[in-house]
């Protein structure tokens, strides 16, 4: 064998070896986002804190894929699934390669009004994984971040739970002491480390209202939607639409109402199992008897519009409540305008 042939064989062997060492390309995702319709839900938390483990153990593989990639993907799907809520959100990471940050924990998206695009962008910047595992320090920082926050708090911790020591549980207990029944802790295990599973399970029980799951548990759109609901949402008793306007003292829709009505049609088309009661409401300008009749006629006007747009009449009923269920004062013009409204109540 000539020297040239030996060189060619060596190059081929190195190429084969290099290919064998590469991570497999993930198969096409079967995950389909099932977005939750904002109008059908009310937030049960006023603040959402996402904590992502970016330490060196997360750079290890689980089922042939890097755990850190699995964790980031899980949070990205959570972000895509949750409704566009009026809540504050924080994304804090810990660990980090020195090439990303010299700090062991940082608020990548500081506590501020929720922006789906903002959270997605912040999440995409956290690369690569590396460094120690100071979860305890990260949770202590969260306690400080939340000091000015009002209302309920939901915290989702995404980690493999490895190499955390005792400080992580100590910090979780301190958070519970500081925020009490305002706080619920949810944990998502990446991988299958037994000690990590135990740690995250115990952490989720600190507040008495959390849950421990694995990333594998939310690998479908339906499962992720259920988890987002558990963390953030309560079913809305009714959907209030103040943008459905009528001509004064009439049951004739104003043109400004149509965009909102089209949104209702979209919701009903996307949820074909859903039936609704269309509820009409008025202010207190006229007599109570007159307002009952007016509110009923307005509800029927909305029902006719929806039916003409393809919504089965069997899915809809109407009820006029007149002035009897105000959501604002009738002593001001603004309050009266808020009380002149249509609500849709989901029926089981």
Segments and roles (model prediction):
Residues 20-22:
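Bacterial signal peptide processing site
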Residues 1-8:
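Bacterial N-terminal signal peptides that target proteins for export
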Residues 26-36, 41-159, 163-166, 188-198:
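Von Willebrand factor
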Residues 25-47, 200-275:
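Periplasmic peptidoglycan-binding/tethering modules of Gram-negative envelope proteins
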Residues 16-18:
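C-terminal motif of bacterial Sec signal peptides marking the signal peptidase cleavage site
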Residues 41, 74, 79-82, 246, ...:
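Periplasmic peptidoglycan-binding/anchoring modules of Gram-negative envelope and division proteins
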Residues 61, 165, 281-348:
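Periplasmic OmpA-like peptidoglycan-binding domain that tethers envelope proteins to the cell wall
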